[in-house]
A protein has these predicted regions:
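Substrate-binding cleft of extracellular glycoside hydrolase catalytic domains
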Residues: 1-87
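Sec/Tat-exported extracytoplasmic proteins
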Residues: 18-21, 47, 51, 82-85, ...
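Catalytic cores of transferase enzymes with a strong primary signal for eukaryotic protein kinases
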Residues: 28, 44-47, 58, 86-90, ...
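Catalytic domains of cell-wall/extracellular-matrix polysaccharide-remodeling enzymes
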Residues: 53-128
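Functionally critical loop-and-helix segments that line ligand-binding/catalytic clefts
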Residues: 104-180
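Amphipathic alpha-helical oligomerization/assembly segments
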Residues: 177-208
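Short, solvent-exposed mixed-charge patches
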Residues: 212-213
Length: 213
């Protein structure tokens, strides 16, 4: 989502991701040459709700503006996003842009960093922009391949465990078992026992088929 552009499949993908159980967040591409409040007004009208993950401010354009304006409007957009959705947004950027144009600003480390630095594994650790000491997400490639998607895609690492990612998205990393799970487990145990008895009758010794070294 940008100052005047929205992916024509955004609404479809937004609803589809929820239906598929995929953690969701939307990102706004900052235009430093436009009013920050108007930009976030438009973003909020398109997205309409908070995501599972924090929404994202994509900071990598100058808009042919001086660094002072880029800094001011970046920080203003971050404040606006937090005010609209009740959660500090992620900052998506790269050292090559952030450090020379914005630099180490007071309080910026309060916003989690989604850093872009290609290409892992040649690059073992991303270069973190001024103002942060660590990252929450690392976009390590823009040439990835994912089953079911013919085009190249971006790939990312999360700086934590799966349980920490679930908690970050507001979920319970240790949810209770779904209703009716115990009868299904008992059925699986019974079927496994029947399969084991049959396999042992065919010469299986519990480790490998007889005669195979």
């Amino acid at each position: 989502i940008g100052h005047s552009y929205t992916d024509d499949r955004f609404a479809q993908n937004w609803l589809g991701a929820r239906a598929a159980g995929i953690f969701r967040a939307a990102y706004h591409v900052l235009r430093p040459d436009h009013d920050p409040v108007a930009q976030i007004d438009r973003f909020a009208s398109v997205v309409g709700e908070a995501g599972d993950l924090p929404h994202v401010l994509d900071v990598e354009l100058t808009g042919e503006q001086p660094d002072r304006v880029i800094r001011e409007r970046t920080l203003a957009c971050l404040r606006e996003l937090e005010g609209r959705f009740g959660r500090k947004p992620l900052v998506y950027t790269a050292d090559w842009f952030w450090t020379p144009h914005i630099g180490a600003q007071p309080g910026v480390a309060d916003y989690d960093l989604w850093v872009a630095h290609y290409y892992w594994p040649t690059v073992q650790e991303p270069k973190v922009p001024a103002g942060w000491s660590t990252w929450r997400l690392w976009q390590h490639s823009n040439r990835g391949q994912v089953a079911g998607i013919p085009a190249r895609v971006d790939l990312d690492f999360f700086g934590g465990t799966m349980e920490e990612l679930i908690a970050y998205a507001g979920g319970d990393p240790n949810p209770p078992p779904p209703p009716g799970i115990e009868p299904r487990v008992r059925n699986l145990e019974r079927w496994a026992g029947e399969l084991d008895a049959w396999a042992r009758g065919q010469g299986y010794d519990g480790v490998r088929p007889t005669g195979i070294g």
